Amino acid sequence: MKKLCVWAVAALLMAACTPKAEKATDSGLLQSNFQMEVNGKKTDLYTLRNKNNMEVCITNFGGRIVSVMVPDKDGQMRDVVLGFDSIQDYVSKPSDFGASIGRYANRINQGKFTLDGTEYQLPQNNYGHCLHGGPQGFQYRVFDAVQPNPQELELTYVAEDGEEGFPGNITCKVLMKLTDDNAIDIRYEAETDKPTIVNMTNHSYFNLDGDAARNEAHLLTIDADYYTPV
């Protein structure tokens, strides 16, 4: 009987010491792969989910949408955006995948602009032009994150006066909400202490047939009177 008790205690101790397997998101992501430190600030992975079990995963590194699991026409869940599986991949393979772009999205010709009579010279990181806020734009910064409920995430980044050549201290907020009609609502707010320019956007790469499929045969229709050639 004593030997049986010893074995029972040993089994209980082994069970107590065995770490519980980490549960992956529906898109197969592990939160631990997104928990590290970049430039002295902690990164993480945040998951939004609505009543339809649609899932959106976001990291505060660059305010990036990492995955979007949405039902297709047959009800099968598909990840319809491109993204990496870890922060290390985002750091070691620079890209704009899913990022919150700022301070100024798109190109600024020759990296120059004039505001209130003052000419500003920005980094020329794209064939002589300034692209997406420069080589260290918001997409490579760590945002402060607050998740007030399962369907919303608030991201905040404070850019200092002169960062990437832009004037003014500026507090930028990215408010992401997953609605119950399977839409991702993204709103941008910016507050500055002096005249500046700001133009933020999200840079997700979509594949509406799922990330494992090729998208060369997709047809995109833009319901607009005008568009800006790039």
Stretch-by-stretch model annotation:
Residues 14-16:
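C-terminal motif of bacterial Sec signal peptides marking the signal peptidase cleavage site
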Residues 2-8:
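Sec-dependent signal peptide recognition
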Residues 18-54, 60-230:
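An exposed, glycine/acidic-rich loop-and-rim segment of catalytic or binding clefts
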